[in-house]
């Protein structure tokens, strides 16, 4: 993304963390609750023009038992925190790709269930409603990318490329950048 936007003109700070959730505590992995980490991140990266949020896949884990609507409540909390900590920043909310149909089966990720797949497919609708209510930009990642056949959860390089291009186009639209 830095390369496409032009080094020097734009600076991208990536804060992805494997296992991060919106509001849930992972009893086996510390510091995965996004709402607890966000205030420090906002302070670290003050004066961001645009903050992109793509969370929710890990919230679909069976241990949390969360519905898409409950995950949406976590997203609403995150958006509120951004509004409070970075009031001048624009926000792009991205609903994550769907989990693959077999992600919960033996040989894949036992932290997910069949219900997890269904919940992941409902996130875009919930997130779109939040984006409309909050008057923020929205992108449905599942419209552009899908999980790899290898693990049914993460994107392969081609799907990363497809999603990156969609995000790039959305950033251009939001920021009014002329190519």
Q: What do these predicted regions represent?
A:
Residues 8-23:
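A short beta-strand-loop structural module common to alpha/beta enzyme folds
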Residues 1-8:
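A short, Lys/Arg-enriched amphipathic alpha-helix followed by its capping loop at the start of a domain
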Residues 22-33:
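Structural motif
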Residues 32-179:
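Alpha-helical cap/lid subdomain in secreted, periplasmic
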